[in-house]
Amino acid sequence: MYKQGIFTIEENRPLTASVYRMVLEGDTRYITAPGQFINIALEGKFLRRPISVCDYDSRTVTIIYKVVGQGTAQMAKMQPGETLDVLTGLGNGYTMEPVHHALLIGGGVGVPPLYNLCKCLRAAGQQVTVILGFNTADEVFYAEEFAALGAEVRITTVDGSVGTKGFVTDAFPADYDYFYTCGPLPMLRAVYDRSATSGQFSFEERMGCGFGACMGCSCKTKYGNKRICKDGPVLVKEEIVW
């Protein structure tokens, strides 16, 4: 179930040159699982902006977004105390599997939804390895935050300026029991091909409504068409059709 509400900005600050962290205060009761997203209405924009939930508690929700267009540029200029019209409780989120060693793989702005998942997995006593993939060292964010949760953090950069040179698939551990991933489509496909176990994929798609009515984000699976906004954004490996 989703809920519309007015949220107040408590924090809005840059993590890198183009990536920002925003903390919103409001009714978070409808956010119930890691990997869900919110949909933000912006003044003068017809469509809401879907942004994954990085973390949440009983009072606030934290999002991390990249400035890529007019809408997110508008968000980056907003100040604490300003308000936003937000839909919460969107998407299915990740389902935690009872395994010993979980592998989390995030690329770019696919990193944020894995943070709350990592927190939940660590609270359940699971060993967690996190692979964070970026283009350069200047783009890296949240590595210390994942490490503070007790996860082993591996960083990859395309240019080799920090961590392993290459892609997230170049940093896989020898053994793990299950994986969760979020990132751009080419990365997800590479993870699918490289992975040796079952896992869950969170897809990033353009969408109109955010709650399954417009069918603008429909995708094909082995079990029929699914809407990324409502039936996803998380799909299990066994149902994905590339």
What feature does the model see in each segment?
Residues 1-3, 225-242:
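Short, basic/aromatic-enriched C-terminal tail that caps enzymatic domains
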Residues 46-53, 91-98, 229:
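Short, Lys/Arg- and Gly-enriched loop/turn segments at beta-strand edges
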Residues 188, 202, 211, 233-242:
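Nucleotide-activated chemistry modules centered on ATP-dependent adenylation/adenylyltransferase
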